[in-house]
């Protein structure tokens, strides 16, 4: 029996499109927006931020040096957070209903810049009983360490926890830890999966 439901954040609860931020950085650094993510990936700066190795201000400074722009930290955060769009991908009412009968845990590869903004602007997150965030755990999916942290936050055995994520590799990592995991495709699909398990 499922006693806890664990949700990924990006592209499961909320939609994001990094190109929205890259297009704002393009005129500041003179690098084409479609080339910026390649440079960011090669630098591993975002991974270092989301794994807790880099503090937000260090990340902003090093990214500015990498790409060649100089703006205030506040302006950088505004641009970096502009990648998220509303509405939520899963209805808040569904998440709220689940939270009344089951332990709700958020499990996300994220950073404090994004999460602080999301927490303030997306009330859906307030229904979660626990948040397991990569920059706090200092481990990113599919590292077993972060799944173990989520299992502990849920407070139940792995097989009693349902998990959904949009990335197949992360679903596989969860299954390897014993979680009942399904790749997210749509709200209706996840609702059906939860209904079939007696969660809703």
Question: What are these model-predicted stretches?
Answer:
Residues 1-41, 176:
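Active-site neighborhood of HAD-like aspartate-dependent phosphohydrolases
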Residues 8, 43, 100-101, 127:
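Structured helix-beta-strand junction loops
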Residues 1-3, 7, 111-112, 116-200:
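Asp-based, Mg2+/Mn2+-dependent phosphohydrolase catalytic module
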């Amino acid at each position: 029996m499922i006693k806890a439901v664990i949700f990924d954040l990006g592209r499961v609860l909320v939609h994001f499109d990094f190109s929205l931020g890259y297009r704002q950085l393009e005129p500041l650094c003179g690098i084409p927006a479609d080339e910026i993510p390649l440079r960011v990936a090669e630098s591993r700066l975002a991974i270092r931020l989301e794994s807790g190795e880099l503090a937000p201000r260090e990340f902003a400074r090093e990214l500015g040096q990498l790409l060649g722009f100089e703006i205030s930290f506040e302006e950088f955060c505004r641009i970096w957070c502009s990648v998220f769009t509303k509405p939520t991908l899963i209805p808040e009412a569904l998440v709220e209903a689940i939270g009344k009968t089951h332990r709700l845990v958020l499990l996300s590869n994220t950073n404090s810049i994004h999460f602080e903004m999301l927490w303030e602007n997306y009330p859906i997150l307030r229904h979660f009983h626990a948040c397991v965030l990569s920059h706090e755990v200092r481990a990113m999916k599919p590292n077993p360490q972060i799944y173990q942290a989520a299992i502990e936050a849920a407070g139940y055995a792995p097989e009693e926890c349902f998990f959904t994520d949009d990335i197949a590799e992360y679903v596989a990592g969860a299954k390897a830890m014993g979680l009942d995991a399904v790749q997210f495709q749509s709200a209706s699909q996840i609702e059906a999966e939860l209904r079939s398990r007696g969660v809703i």
